[in-house]
Design a protein with these regions (language model features):
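Structural beta-alpha unit
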Residues: 73-112, 119-120, 139
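Gly/Ser-rich helix-loop-strand patches that form or flank binding pockets
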Residues: 110-147
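Small/aliphatic-rich secondary-structure junction motif
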Residues: 2-47
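Short, well-ordered secondary-structure micro-motifs
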Residues: 16, 43-47, 89-94, 124-125
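Acidic, proline/glycine-rich short linear motifs
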Residues: 37-64, 86
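Active-site phosphate/pyrophosphate- and oxyanion-stabilizing loops and adjacent acidic/basic residues
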Residues: 67, 101, 131
């Protein structure tokens, strides 16, 4: 079994990775940090993965995320995925959530550690990944709300 951490480099995702690493010692499980990188330059720009004048390079973004994961949790594994564009009607957030859920299922995640200020609240911003990921009954969810 695996502890899965969707990781975007934010303070909350870093804290979620730290918590998963601490928890892994108690459960004797591996930690997998997952970065989902949509093939959308604006998404990368909004998250601070690239600057406005930088070329959009998925491999370079993945390398930077892997370095950040290594700095926070050297014992964690890192993986990145580029979500499939299944439907032109789906939002980028929907694609990211679907990818996180697919990977969680694939690696048989026992717990997903999500860094989210608003997961589980009554109203959820459209761009929130935390709430939809937390709705899947196949795994437990640890929500980190404070970095």
């Amino acid at each position: 079994m695996v502890l899965l951490v969707p990781f975007d480099g934010s303070d909350l995702s870093r804290t979620a990775l730290e918590r998963a690493t601490e928890f892994a010692t108690y459960r004797n499980e591996d930690v997998l940090a997952l970065t989902v990188i949509p093939n959308e330059p604006e998404y990368a720009l909004e998250r601070g993965w690239v600057d406005a004048n930088d070329p959009f390079d998925i491999e370079a973004i993945a390398d930077r995320m892997a370095e950040q994961v290594e700095a926070v949790a050297p014992e964690a594994s890192f993986r990145y995925e580029v979500p499939e564009d299944v439907s032109s009607m789906a939002s980028i957030t929907t694609d990211v959530v679907r990818t996180v859920r697919q990977v969680a299922n694939e690696v048989d995640a026992s717990i997903v550690f999500v860094g989210s200020e608003n997961a589980g609240r009554v109203s959820t911003p459209v761009s929130s990944v935390g709430s939809p990921v937390s709705e899947d009954p196949q795994y437990d969810v640890h929500i980190v709300r404070h970095a």
